Structures are given as structure tokens and as C-alpha cells.
Amino acid sequence: MDTCGIYNSDNEEFSQENDGENDGGDKIIKNLPFASYDERLNSFQNWPIQLLPSKEQLSRAGFIYLNIGDQVQCFYCDLKLKEWKRSDNPFEEHKKHTQDLKINCLFVKSIEFDNFVKNHSESCFQNPITNNINQDLDHNQDLDHNQDLDQNSTTSDCDVLTCKICFTNKITKVLIPCGHSSCYECVFKLQTCPICKNNFIKINNLFI
């Protein structure tokens, strides 16, 4: 694995000293090409099929194909990598090289937080407290009505935690200053808040 240069290396947006952690969120760069997964995946139409990692893995890690050998570039921080090996994990390589080069890639940080949330939280429908309640209700037919109410409440909770843009992912980002939420994928495609239509300049992690 090797880097092949980065753009905007002198841009304060990408310096660790200006990552916004001390002033209520990370400043986000908007209106970037290839902000969506599908757009990035389409850039790999000429990706040699025999090469690994796959174009899907690279796209999910934020990369687009430059149509030169196996060179790819992050849509957000412009990090460029080449000379991929079969054992390489695109996201881990992205994370490693941005850390080594002291690039503050908000896309990498967003995926890392989303992975943390997935690894440390139970599914809405597999909450251990809810499961225990449901088990107790199964043994008591007189409480069937309460069981239905509990299940409806659980479903409602899941709806609240679902991104209202894609209706697929869990919300993990807060738009600043309006306070509305988004998932880690949709936030990079937004120009204004889709709920209140106001502009936002930063995002922050949402702990639920």
C-alpha cells in the first residue's frame, strides 16, 4: 500500500488543530462530488475485476477510482492510495494513512463512530429489557393487551431512531445549529437541513 499524494494538504479544513472538537462539532465541507455511495461506485466502472479489494469495499470506504492503475482517492479529504494488496481493508487503510499524514477526514471519523455505535448497541428489536418483558407476558395470558402495547412502543422507538432521509440507517449525526439528525451516509449529501430547510455548518455525533 502506498500513498500517491493528497490535495488540499495546506488547507486548514484538514488540519488536526482545526477539527472543531473544541467548539461544538466538526465543520463539514458540503457540495462535494461523489458524496453518495452510488456515485462513488459508478466511478469504478473500469476497475479491473481481478483486483482486490472490491469496488464495493472501496466505495464504502469513501474512495473513487481515478482510472489509473489501482489509484483511488477519497471524495472528502482527497487522500490518494495505490498498490493495493488482497489483504488490505480499505477503511482501515484510509484511517491509518489519514492518521499518519495528520489529515482530519470527517468521513473516516463518521464511519468510525457509526461502527462503534453498531458494535456497542443492541438492535431495537433485540433490547434485553424488552425481551425479558415479552417473556414474562408470554407466561401470563391475562396480559396479552400489555404485550401488544409494549411491542408497539418498541416499534415506535425504532422509528424514532431511523434516519428520516434514507429510512434505512440509524441516526448518528446532529446538524448544527438546528439540532436535527441524520445518518452518517446521508449527512454528506445534504446542502441544508431537510427538515427545517435551514443551513448547517457543523455536525456532531449523536449518542443514544
From Swiss-Prot:
This is Apoptosis inhibitor 193R. Pfam families: BIR (PF00653), zf-C3HC4_3 (PF13920). SMART domains: BIR (SM00238), RING (SM00184). BIR repeats lie at residues 37-108. Keywords: Apoptosis, Early protein, Host-virus interaction, Inhibition of host caspases by virus, Metal-binding, Modulation of host cell apoptosis by virus, Repeat, Zinc, Zinc-finger. Residues 1-25 are annotated as: Disordered. Residues 10-23 have a biased composition (Acidic residues). It comes from the Viruses. SUPFAM superfamilies: Inhibitor of apoptosis (IAP) repeat. A zinc finger (RING-type) spans 163-197. Zn(2+) binds at C74, C77, H94, C105. Sequence repeats lie at residues 134-139, 140-145, 146-151. PANTHER family: INHIBITOR OF APOPTOSIS (PTHR10044). One of its GO terms (molecular function) is zinc ion binding. Gene3D superfamilies: Inhibitor Of Apoptosis Protein (2mihbC-IAP-1), Chain A (1.10.1170.10), Zinc/RING finger domain, C3HC4 (zinc finger) (3.30.40.10). Residues 134-151 are annotated as: 3 X 6 AA tandem repeats. Belongs to the IIV-6 193R family. InterPro entries: BIR_rpt, IAP, Znf_RING, Znf_RING/FYVE/PHD. Plays a role early in infection by preventing host cell apoptosis. It comes from Invertebrate iridescent virus 6 (IIV-6). One of its GO terms (biological process) is symbiont-mediated suppression of host apoptosis.
